[in-house]
Amino acid sequence: IFLDEIMRQAAESEIIQLSLHIREGKPLSTFKCNGKEVQIFTQKDIVDGMYSWADQIICATNNKRNEINNFVRYKKGFAPETPSIGDKIISLKNHWDCISSRGDWALTNGAIGEITYFSNRNVFVPFYISENPIEVMTTNMKLEDNDNFNQLLLDYKCLTIGVPALSSKQQYQMNNSKMCPDAPYEFAYAYAITCWKAQGSEWNKVLGFEENFPFDKETHKKYLYTLTTRASEKLVLIRK
């Protein structure tokens, strides 16, 4: 009986039906739905309210991610050149030794939260590593479950324009040098994230973009499948 119930729920779920449709290699244009869980639109149908409706926006490319993040921040009235209280951000790397206030989480790649405090940006020169100044800011980040990461030292350039101030080699040198503080953490705005960052996570309401991108047919299918299955309740999908 339990298995029958699971099968019945799966058969009734438009999200599951769409994921199976995609796995079979069928185009989005041929998927039929009543709009209860899944709605599929074209680019010309996009309205601003879709961006604020979604718990998470997912796309394929960094160019699209940056475009959406800039647009959402503009609509929120946030200045483009500086972070704001309430900005949604995502960790780009694992920092297993950085533990949340309650001790429940480590700061991992893909961790998403909201800025609750940030300091004015400061500049320092790790002269043993690089002659170039590095802009940093101290930030507190609140997670969805209200746990917090406090006093995070963020790479300001990485967050605001998407370019890390240090190379991977320089970060390694800083983190392993007794002469320097640890390298600042790399974060990005997270109103939109790429599908690869979204893997393993799930949100109630997802806005997804199919996009045109230079991947083969099989990769495109895997992308759409992963995107679709990130939504647990409702999915709005924008066809390319």
Annotate the PLM regions.
Residues 124-240:
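C-terminal accessory regions
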Residues 1-148:
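Conserved helicase motor core of P-loop NTPases
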